[in-house]
Amino acid sequence: MKLSPREVEKISLHNAGFLAQKRLARGVRLNYSESVALIASQILEHARDGEKTVAQLMSIGKHLLGRRQVLPAVPHLLNIIQVEATLPNGTKLVTVHDPIANENGDLEEALYGSFLPVPSLDKFAESKEEHKIPGEIICADGRLTLNPGRKAVFLKVVNHGDRPIQVGSHYHFIEVNPYLTFDRRKAYGMRLNIAAGDSVRFEPGDHKTVNLVSIGGNKIIRGGNAIADGPVNEANCKAAMEIVCRREFGHKEEEDASEGVTTGDPDCPFTKAIPREEYANKYGPTIGDKIRLGDTDLIAEIEKDFALYGDESVFGGGKVIRDGMGQSSGHPPAMSLDTVITSAVIIDYTGIIKADIGIKDGLIASIGKAGNPDIMNGVFPNMIIGVNTEVICGEGLIVTAGGIDCHVHYICPQSLDEAISSGITTVVGGGTGPTDGSRATTCTPAPTQMKLMLQSTDDIPLNFGFTGKGSGSHPDELHEIIKAGAMGLKLHEDWGCTPAAIDNCLAVAEQHDIQVNIHTDTVNESGFVEHTIAAFNGRTIHTYHSEGAGGGHAPDIIKVCSMKNVLPSSTNTTRPLTSNTVDEHLDMLMVCHKLNREIPEDLAFASSRVREQTIAAEDILHDIGGISIISSDAQAVGRIGEVISCTWQTADKMKAERGPLQPDGSDNDNFRIKRYIAKYTINPAIVNGISQYVGSVEVGKLADLVIWKPSFFGAKPDIVIKGGSIAWADMGDPNGSIPTPEPVLMRPMYGTLGKAGSALSIAFVSKAALDLGVKVLYGLNKRVEAVSNVRKLTKLDLKLNNSLPEITVCPETFTVTVDGQALSSEAVTTLPLSQNYFIF
């Protein structure tokens, strides 16, 4: 066929579109991805017919689907579709704005070329149901004053040129086009008093009166036409006016120009204020505004905003971050940021704030106000945007710390793509590939295997940690795997999780300051849960899948969540309890643990692990902070790409069931949001001794960041930043004239190629391995760091998830009682972050 790469990409788009047509033909309302695929692929088909113009194709795209043919969230998720098609006169971009604009679509046209039957409109429900708007911004009432407390002046301006002139908000007004005539002396040190990034356009012959305000910061003028270069003072003003006259720039004195100071008083003529909704549309929500997270019922309210209204650093044509304006001149690379993320909403366990994020040398250098200190107030000293600074526009977007999955079976390397594309940037676990041992346990047993796993993942843009096998009652072998690079040890019943093995493993871990992860004895062979707790002997331990469906003492392993020395986590297939949770688990367990349905004892072993009552209790324990971490158990009773989505599904279910979580009121869910994000960011970092490097959006940590559209939050990120560089991102047609035409896929970027993956990431090992020089011995390019400060941890050290409830479990009914109250939680039939977003 001699196909080009772009043709192969369009075939995948066609396949998705045809799948959507089949679903539409049988009366299924389409989700976001299906709607995009159907409309884009139909445009390509009509283009191939060769009879339609670009304008006609745009029109067709607006009439294929209506609100009744798509899920209720889709009209809010889908506001534009772009695709590049080969027409008889070459490749052209077709853009469809607001493609879901009518009550019903033209279904015959939507199924054109498919030869599928056209369904009756009666098959599609009326679209009158109440529904949430995914990612909606809920603005507080009122207006925001721009540039308060500044000297201001109104000046008359005339365009004597024969072409239009457009002037941006932060352009030094004295420096503008010579064909604009006005009092340039009074404009010295001034700029337009308009919203940052806006502009004023002067058509030929236009007469306009403009409101100017003084520049801020150090008041140093750079750039423009080099009329007034230097600090704002009387001597430089006089020199600038001499240049104005000599170079014949338009100048006319306006002696009676109105001058004053901007205030917060709406009646002050110099005051510029804009409605909060308009502000949010330009720069994202500010303090007091709220965001819905994805299609959940979780509402985040902005607690703090570092922006100075009117001085936001905005990138784009005619915007703020340009030479001498928002971008400084004269600050070399050492003094300026490598990258700035502008005006992002940060959701972290530390708070929900609006700020610029500065990145330098792969680290989070600063969080606050970025820009040009020569003309802007409040720019942080280490947040200078210079000539050597790259920009990622964060307006209207959410930034979180890269997720940490601390229960990973390294069964296949392809799972790592699923991890990073979902927002996971650090993985901890064990395995050697698709061996039976690795399918069941997170252990990398042999020193040679530890070396190989560190080497084989060296170029992958993720932070890695590998755990050795801890199931041994003699210390020597454990010391050897730790020296080979194990950053932790794993006790697992499939290898033996006896009191003797537990005691020995913890004793060795104490010597090396590494964590011990445990999957306890489901069948109670050596004792009950109380005997295992006794073997802990007060020592710190991380209990995997602490509810028990993933493994552990039946039926009451969940009682470990009462213990101060136990750091409990969950795996995501039980997060949260749904009407299908119990039914799917039995076969998972049979496969993972080499069990045989024909052996009654094997069947009983698996069945004993799956208890709806304890899974229901697990939901509530997460909500009260009794379980501290959510992880995956990747490909071994867990899904590596769904750690984040399952966390937010659990939070949403608990809000619906239990109402606001103290200290939240009825207006926001900030405390619950911070509690739940801690479960896959800071808490797994603390437990594994790596929190000084990763786990939160805090200064000094690795710039592992995830950028989300609010409407897709928790389901599909836009950009994953690894060590300060973009590793994965939503990207459209690689042959496209712009980066947004379909098919838009989550794709690896330059941060994954060549030596970048190792340069941007860390391999975590034991201090013993670091001291032995495994980086050089193994030829690793990754930065290698030792884990630390884990052996003294208690649950009280974990963030926002450190409650110590008293838990009992009835051995007959499996009813879980917490602090004297029996727990119950409904098995739900629907969850957010599911069918609105995913084709399969």
From Swiss-Prot:
Please list the residues that bind Ni(2+) 1. 407, 409, 490, 633
Cellular compartments per GO CC? urease complex
Per the entry, what induces it?
Induced in leaves treated with abscisic acid (ABA).
- According to the UniProt entry, which residues carry N6-carboxylysine? 490
Which residues of the sequence carry a binding annotation for Ni(2+) 2?
Answer: 490, 519, 545
- Use in biotechnology or industry: Canatoxin, a urease isoform derived from Canavalia ensiformis seeds, shows insecticidal activity against different insect species. Its toxicity relies on an internal 10 kDa peptide (pepcanatox), released by hydrolysis of canatoxin by cathepsins in the digestive system of susceptible insects. In laboratory feeding experiments is 100% effective against larvae of Dysdercus peruvianus and Spodoptera frugiperda.
Explain the post-translational modification: Carboxylation allows a single lysine to coordinate two nickel ions.
Q: Which principal EC class is assigned to this enzyme?
A: hydrolase
Keyword field contains Hydrolase: yes
Cofactor details (free text): Binds 2 nickel ions per subunit.
Q: Which Pfam families match?
A: Amidohydro_1 (PF01979), Urease_alpha (PF00449), Urease_beta (PF00699), Urease_gamma (PF00547), Urease_linker (PF18473)
Example GO BP: urea catabolic process
| Presence of keyword Magnesium | no
Family matches, as Gene3D superfamilies: Metal-dependent hydrolases, Urease, beta subunit, Urease, gamma-like subunit, Urease, subunit C, domain 1
Q: EC number(s) per UniProt?
A: 3.5.1.5
Query: What molecular function terms (GO) are annotated for this protein?
Result: lipid binding; nickel cation binding; urease activity
Q: Which residues bind substrate?
A: 492
Tissue-level expression? Expressed in flower buds and young developing seeds.
- The residue ranges of the Urease domain are 402-840
Q: Write out the entry's keywords from A to Z.
A: Hydrolase, Metal-binding, Nickel
Q: Which cofactor does it need?
A: Ni(2+)
HAMAP family of this UniProt entry? Urease_alpha (MF_01953), Urease_beta (MF_01954)
**Which family is this protein grouped under?**
In the C-terminal section; belongs to the metallo-dependent hydrolases superfamily. Urease alpha subunit family.
List the protein's name: Urease 2
The protein's organism comes out as Canavalia ensiformis (Jack bean)
